[in-house]
Amino acid sequence: MNKDWTSIKKVGLPKLKLIMEHEIMSIYRTKEVLIQTEHEKMFVAFCQKVYKYKEYKEETYWYVNDGTTKVEDEVVAWMELPDRYEGE
């Protein structure tokens, strides 16, 4: 694996930030990163982790297109996005 890629299996997810807390659940989200799936597809996406207290359940999802589309394949690696182009 390229040195810039981070294996989810070996290292884990990007840093999660709490975005919503409620008495029945908490939702955490990462910033957008470049991901690669088990089928070698690549997307710019963010990860969202939901903790459901009543069910003692933890769910992790990846989303693309500003959160409108869920990534169905298993995400195996991620890398930081480069800085935005500022122009000349």
Annotate the PLM regions:
Residues M1-E88:
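Secondary-structure transition motif
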